[in-house]
Amino acid sequence: MIASKFGIGQQVRHSLLGYLGVVVDIDPEYSLDEPSPDELAVNDELRAAPWYHVVMEDDNGQPVHTYLAEAQLRSEMRDEHPEQPSMDELARTIRKQLQAPRLRN
């Protein structure tokens, strides 16, 4: 069994670029159907580790969905980010839904 370092709803930072993001889903290993040429360069060890669907903001404050390897992320210690309140709200909303899921039927 593969253990993931980060959880759904957790705030993380891109380790090279420093962008703040929120984990919205986790794959136990690389699982995109058709990798792009850049993704083909990823080594097998990295592909076998967990990969994360992370929502980040672009330079205009618009949400961007990214797919990142565990090695590309680091933990974010702060819970509040006045410069990016939408990321804080997204993380809170996801964590709240995980704690008390809505029954639809």
Curated annotation (Swiss-Prot):
Name recorded for this polypeptide: Heat shock protein HspQ
MF terms (GO), sorted A to Z: DNA binding
Region (Disordered): 77-105
Annotated GO CC locations: cytoplasm
InterPro entries: Hemimethylated_DNA-bd_dom, Hemimethylated_DNA-bd_sf, HspQ
Location within or outside the cell: Cytoplasm
Keyword Nucleotidyltransferase appears in the UniProt entry: no
Free-text function comment from the UniProt entry: Involved in the degradation of certain denaturated proteins, including DnaA, during heat shock stress.
GO biological process: response to heat
Pfam family, one: YccV-like
Organism, as annotated: Salmonella arizonae (strain ATCC BAA-731 / CDC346-86 / RSK2980)
Keywords annotated in UniProt: Cytoplasm, Stress response
Family according to the record: Belongs to the HspQ family.
Superkingdom field: Bacteria
Entries under SUPFAM superfamilies matching the protein: YccV-like
